[in-house]
Amino acid sequence: MSLMDPLANALNHLSNCERVGKDVAYVQPASKLIGRVFKVMQDKGYMGNFEYIEDGKAGIYKVELTGHINKCGAVRPRYAVKKTEFEKFEKRYLPAKGFGLLIVSTPKGLMTHDEAKSNGLGGRLISYIY
């Protein structure tokens, strides 16, 4: 069976493990995009350390959970967002102003919507977390 959206599956797995109360989640298959999204989440304090484990196939990420994730998910379709349009998507995906993050793919790499706004960049919405 093939996976249609590995990022959505990875974020859903993190949400489920967090809800059940696990300390560690094993996410597979691993990809560069998933690793970069995890890096942004780690930098903002939503999860602890994560490491890549080679298993001879697609790889596995071992993620330490901290209990700070209420909900996270992938944004489908990947909407193109101008630097002035972030507020519309904040209202759609986040529960309150200033609470949570939208992760955006910009020409400068993955970053949060606040960083993209301050740098004057637009991009494509990848995921949300709060």
From Swiss-Prot:
UniProt keyword annotation of Membrane present: no
InterPro entries for the chain: Ribosomal_uS8 (IPR000630), Ribosomal_uS8_CS (IPR047863), Ribosomal_uS8_sf (IPR035987)
Keyword rRNA-binding found: yes
Alphabetic keyword roster: Ribonucleoprotein, Ribosomal protein, RNA-binding, rRNA-binding
One Gene Ontology molecular-function label: structural constituent of ribosome
SUPFAM superfamilies recorded: Ribosomal protein S8
GO cellular component: ribonucleoprotein complex; ribosome
Pfam families membership: Ribosomal_S8
Gene Ontology biological process terms from the UniProt entry: translation
Source superkingdom: Archaea
Coiled-coil positions: none
Matching Gene3D superfamilies: 3.30.1370.30, 3.30.1490.10
PANTHER family for this protein: 40S RIBOSOMAL PROTEIN S15A
Function description: One of the primary rRNA binding proteins, it binds directly to 16S rRNA central domain where it helps coordinate assembly of the platform of the 30S subunit.
Family listed: Belongs to the universal ribosomal protein uS8 family.
SUBUNIT field: Part of the 30S ribosomal subunit.
Protein name per Swiss-Prot or TrEMBL: Small ribosomal subunit protein uS8
Annotated source species: Methanococcus aeolicus (strain ATCC BAA-1280 / DSM 17508 / OCM 812 / Nankai-3)
